[in-house]
Each structure stands twice: as structure tokens, then as C-alpha cells.
Design a protein with these regions (language model features):
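Membrane-interfacial amphipathic/re-entrant helices at transmembrane-helix boundaries
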Residues: 1-21
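Hydrophobic alpha-helical transmembrane segments
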Residues: 13-17, 61-66, 91-92, 131-136, ...
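Alpha-helical transmembrane segments in multi-pass membrane proteins
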Residues: 15, 19-23, 49, 53, ...
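Helix-loop-helix "hairpin" substructures at the membrane interface of multi-pass membrane proteins
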Residues: 19, 130-202
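Short loop segments and helix-boundary regions at transmembrane helix junctions
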Residues: 28-111, 207-219, 235-240
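Conserved small/polar residues in nucleotide/adenosyl-binding loops
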Residues: 242-250
């Protein structure tokens, strides 16, 4: 069966490519700057925005984006305080987001929402709106890193040296935290909260085994991430198809 004839599969392929580009770019900064734990905190904090959106009757993705960006700024601000440890600030927003998400989800009017769609995602259900969101984000990240690759590399490896070069480190760090939050939210419907952090770290860690160049890690991460998504799509199809046929046979018998 030719899978490429189906619109949902075409969307899945294009979404995989766009998500790999966005995650490959910002994920390289995350791994180099050692922000993996912070990114995990923002990922789980986004659940609070999802619950708030379900409760208020607005788009969960929109509310998750706002909540995630504010959480990212909050973590960045608290981590700069001398009386607050960075890991403690992350834990605050991590637990707060999950708690609010669960509470608002079950308080939302009507039927209980299906949270598995946001926790685990479903790459075959992404639509044109999701693709536009991923495409715009990938374009913004590409342009931002193309224009400011040098100060970003300086900040990723040595913030004090970056300050000595008159680079506005704080502004860049807040902007990059915003991009991290938006990338996480853009990938929620595709891979979910549980696996979003994987696209932001595993391809980059794998690429780092072969090169130490920041730019090369970005390119390799995009390729590795896209191949991983393709592998998951083409491997899962025959497994799902076999399971479906077995279920149909059992039902017939």
C-alpha cells in the first residue's frame, strides 16, 4: 500500500521535517549550554497551560504557548537570583505546571478531555495549522541563528567571554528561552509532552559524538532527528496494520 497517497501521512512527513529543523537548531543550543533539565521543566510546565486552555474553553496549544513562555522567563529570572538555586527554580515550575494541568483538566466543563493526545501526541493527527506553526517557527529559528550565530555560540560556551565582547547576554538568553518554550509547544501534538524533550536532546547528543563544531551539530541533528521520525513512521505502520488485522480476525471469529 502506497502510504504517500494519504494526506495524513504527507502531513506527518512534512511535520517531521519541520520539527527536526526547529528542534535541531534550538536543541543544539540546549545541549551545548547544558539546559536539558531546564527544557524538561518547561516541557512539563506546558501541561499547566493545556489544562488552563481546556478549562477556559480556548485553544490548549495557545494557552500552553503563553504558559510555557512565562514559565521559561520565570525559570530564567529565578535562576539569576543569588538566593535561589537553578534546579530549585526548575522544580517549582515543573511541579506547578503538572499540578495545574491535572486540576484544570478535570475541572473543565463537559466530558473529561483525552489528555493522552497531549502527553504522548499523535504524529498522524497533525493538521495544516500545526504545519504552519512548525514552519513559521523553523523559519524564525533559521533566520535568528543565521544572523546571530556568533553571539549565540559565545553565550553557549562562555557567557563571561560573551559579556566581555559587549554582547547583551541577558537579552539573548531570554529570547532563546522563549524559542525553547515555543519549540516544545509546537511539537506537543506531534510527539507529546513525554517525548518532546527527546527531539531536543538525543539527535544533538548523537551528533556531538561525531563533531564538536556548533554548526555541524545543527546540521547532523536535523538529519538524525528526521531519520528517527521516518524510522518511527515506517516501522510503526506494519506493526499497527498487523495488530488491526488480528483484531478484525478476532472480532469475526
Amino acid at each position: 500500500m502506497n502510504l504517500l497517497q494519504y494526506t495524513f501521512f504527507q502531513h506527518a512527513l512534512l511535520g517531521s521535517l519541520l520539527a527536526s529543523i526547529a528542534c535541531g537548531i534550538i536543541g543544539t543550543y540546549i545541549v551545548t549550554r547544558r539546559l536539558v533539565f531546564i527544557s524538561g521543566g518547561i516541557t512539563h510546565a506546558s501541561f499547566g497551560g493545556i489544562g488552563l486552555g481546556l478549562f477556559a474553553g480556548i485553544s490548549p496549544i495557545l494557552s500552553a504557548a503563553v504558559f510555557s513562555v512565562l514559565s521559561a522567563f520565570g525559570v530564567e529570572w529565578l535562576s539569576r537570583r543569588k538566593d535561589m538555586r537553578e534546579d530549585s527554580a526548575i522544580a517549582v515550575f515543573w511541579t506547578l505546571g503538572m499540578a495545574l494541568g491535572i486540576m484544570f483538566s478535570f475541572l473543565s466543563p463537559g466530558f473529561a478531555p483525552d489528555l493522552s493526545a497531549y502527553l504522548f501526541g499523535n504524529i498522524l493527527t497533525i493538521n495544516q495549522t500545526d504545519l504552519w506553526m512548525l514552519g513559521i517557527l523553523a523559519l524564525l529559528l533559521t533566520g535568528f541563528f543565521y544572523l546571530f550565530i556568533r553571539p549565540i555560540v559565545y553565550i553557549a560556551f562562555d557567557r563571561e567571554f560573551a559579556r566581555s565582547q559587549k554582547i547583551p547576554v541577558e537579552i539573548f538568553e531570554y529570547l532563546l528561552m522563549m524559542f525553547i518554550a515555543l519549540t516544545i509547544v509546537a511539537c506537543l501534538r506531534m510527539v507529546g509532552i513525554v517525548l518532546a524533550i527527546s527531539l531536543l536532546t538525543i539527535p544533538q547528543m548523537t551528533a556531538n559524538l561525531f563533531t564538536y563544531s556548533f554548526k555541524k551539530i545543527i546540521w547532523l541533528s536535523i538529519g538524525i532527528g528526521f531519520l528517527g521520525c521516518l524510522g518511527g513512521l515506517f516501522i510503526s505502520y506494519p506493526v499497527s496494520y498487523t495488530h488491526l488485522r488480528a483484531h478484525e480476525t478476532d472480532s469475526y471469529l
